[in-house]
């Protein structure tokens, strides 16, 4: 039976919570980034970083602070087994996406499991609510956006309604679409 790692991914401070439960095969921490991106519904248009047990993981060239004070370990070279298939694995850690908007996610490692019948990793087992749109100002900007769209008398309503003519259905989430996205991989930019 192949190894499968199970994680619950929750967008921190989202209310009501936006979350996914994913099952992934052995791979690198960079692969986990790709699976989180696609399961959540992000577009991979910004930088990201994992913070696990007081260490930072990501792309060292992109995340160098210029002062040599923040050491970033290359996520391409770190296997999930290195972090989670050991006596004292990290149980909870964070994943930040888009340092401008500051989308913080808590990842809870739920264990190394046998995949449920009919579920081949990578896949999304369950989740709730739509991913917020990119570049809307983080969790607080998203809440403001939803407030504006809910009030046709709001002074910013026309502008926001132009960007989102059909509104935003925050409750829409389809597990099968998240699984399909996880298997297809990240969007290709510049094609």
Which residues fall in each region the model found?
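Short linear regulatory motifs enriched in tryptophan with gly/pro/ser
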Residues: 1-191
């Amino acid at each position: 039976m192949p190894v499968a790692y199970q994680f619950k991914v929750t967008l921190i401070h989202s209310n009501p919570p936006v979350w996914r439960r994913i099952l992934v095969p052995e791979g690198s921490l960079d692969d986990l980034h790709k699976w989180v991106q696609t399961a959540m519904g992000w577009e991979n248009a910004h930088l990201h970083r994992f913070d696990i047990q007081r260490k930072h993981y990501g792309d060292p060239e992109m995340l160098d602070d210029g002062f040599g004070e923040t050491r970033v370990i290359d996520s391409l070279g770190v296997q999930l087994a290195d972090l989670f298939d050991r006596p004292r694995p990290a149980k909870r850690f964070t994943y930040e996406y888009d340092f401008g908007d500051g989308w913080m996610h808590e990842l809870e490692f739920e264990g190394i499991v046998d995949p449920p019948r009919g579920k081949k990793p990578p896949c999304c087992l369950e989740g709730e609510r739509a991913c917020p749109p990119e570049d809307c100002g983080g969790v607080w900007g998203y809440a403001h956006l939803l407030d504006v769209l809910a009030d046709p008398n709001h002074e910013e309503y026309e502008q926001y309604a132009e960007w989102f003519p059909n509104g935003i259905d925050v409750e829409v989430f389809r597990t099968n679409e998240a699984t399909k996205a996880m298997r297809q991989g990240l969007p290709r930019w510049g094609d």
